[in-house]
Design a protein with these regions (language model features):
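Glycine-rich phosphate-binding loops of nucleotide-dependent enzymes
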Residues: 1-147
C-alpha cells in the first residue's frame, strides 16, 4: 500500500469509505502530506514519516494522543516544525489530550500546558512551563547537581 491506502484502510472498519476518505484527506492536508499521498511511507524523509504516524493516530479520533519522543532523530528545524504541528493539533482538536514524552525540553516547553518532570522514575515536579523552567530542583536535575 501507499500511505494513503494504509490510512484509509485503517479507518474503514468504523465509517463509510466516503466519510473516511474525507477525514483522511483533511488530516493529511493539515500535516502537509496531501500532495505526496501516493508515495510509499518508507520513501518519505524521517520527519514526514513521523507526521504520518501522527495522522494515522488522529484519523481514529482518539481522546488521548500519546507522542513518545516525537522529536527523536530530528534536527532543530524539524523539531520546531513538529512543535508547531502539535500546537495546531491541540488547538484544532479541543476534545483530545496530548501526552508528550520527550527529552527535548524546547519542544516540551513550547507545546505543553502542564508538564511533569520525572527523574530516575520519580516525579520531580509538575506545573506549567514557566513553573518548571524556574523550579530549582528541575534545574539541578538537568545540570546533574545534587544527590
Amino acid at each position: 500500500y501507499n500511505f494513503w491506502d494504509g490510512i484509509v484502510k485503517n479507518k474503514r472498519y468504523k465509517q463509510e469509505e466516503e466519510t473516511c476518505a474525507k477525514i483522511c484527506e483533511e488530516a493529511l492536508k493539515d500535516m502537509g502530506l496531501w500532495e505526496i499521498r501516493n508515495q510509499l511511507a518508507r520513501n518519505l524523509p524521517y520527519g514526514m514519516q513521523r507526521r504520518l504516524e501522527i495522522v494515522r493516530a488522529l484519523v481514529t479520533s482518539p481522546k488521548l494522543l500519546l507522542l513518545d519522543e516525537p522529536a527523536a532523530g530530528m534536527n532543530e528545524d524539524e523539531s520546531e516544525s513538529l512543535a508547531g504541528v502539535i500546537r495546531e493539533i491541540s488547538e484544532k482538536n479541543k476534545g483530545i489530550t496530548i501526552l508528550v514524552i520527550d527529552h527535548h525540553m524546547d519542544v516540551i516547553m513550547s507545546v505543553c500546558d502542564e508538564i511533569t518532570v520525572i527523574n530516575f522514575g520519580s516525579q520531580l515536579a509538575t506545573g506549567n512551563p514557566e513553573e518548571i523552567q524556574n523550579n530549582q530542583e528541575v534545574i539541578d536535575a538537568y545540570l546533574g547537581v545534587g544527590d
